[in-house]
């Protein structure tokens, strides 16, 4: 059964372009990234704590796997904030989301983990930078927008994956029907 596993980067870029119409998003994300650079691992750990607490993933009971996941996710968050308009972070994201699809992880759980982490990131920004700064709301908005961008790409990945699954299923059913009635070779 051959099926398309990759998301077209042009589709991802189209979503990035919509969010990047605000030309201030990239500089604000870079500033957030610089402010939180020493806390990226904390953000990543908080994200993975959600998945660990579910108790559904045996591989997350292995401390080495958890450490690798936290380290990779911290690097991903840094790349996303450092170059929100770039493609590298989104390629990593689409690979991770396609893996989640193939493993049957519901989108609602992925969204919950990201949204929960978003609130934690805003809390950290307030602690590190302070809510009294004039541009705090702009920086908080950048975090929310970056998460909205990420969630949009995630939804597109899940939609594409399920469309491919349905197309594959229809082809298989059609081939089976043709075989059953003696049309196929």
Regions inferred by a protein language model and the residue ranges of each:
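Core of compact, soluble alpha-helical bundle domains
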Residues: 1-95, 115, 122-185
């Amino acid at each position: 059964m051959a099926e398309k596993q990759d998301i077209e980067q042009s589709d991802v870029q189209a979503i990035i372009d919509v969010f990047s119409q605000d030309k201030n998003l990239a500089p604000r994300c870079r500033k957030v990234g610089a402010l939180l650079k020493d806390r990226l691992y904390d953000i990543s750990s908080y994200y993975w704590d959600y998945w660990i607490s579910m108790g559904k993933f045996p591989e997350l009971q292995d401390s080495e796997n958890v450490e690798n996941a936290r380290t990779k996710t911290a690097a991903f968050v840094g790349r996303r904030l450092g170059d929100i308009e770039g493609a590298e972070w989104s390629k990593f994201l689409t690979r991770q989301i396609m893996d989640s699809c193939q493993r049957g992880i519901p989108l609602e759980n992925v969204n919950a983990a990201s949204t929960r982490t978003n609130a934690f990131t805003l809390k950290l920004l307030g602690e590190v930078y302070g809510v009294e700064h004039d541009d705090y709301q702009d920086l908080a908005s950048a975090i929310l927008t970056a998460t909205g961008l990420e969630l949009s790409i995630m939804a597109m990945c899940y939609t594409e994956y399920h469309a491919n699954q349905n197309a594959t299923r229809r082809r298989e059913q059609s081939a089976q029907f043709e075989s059953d009635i003696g049309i196929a070779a």
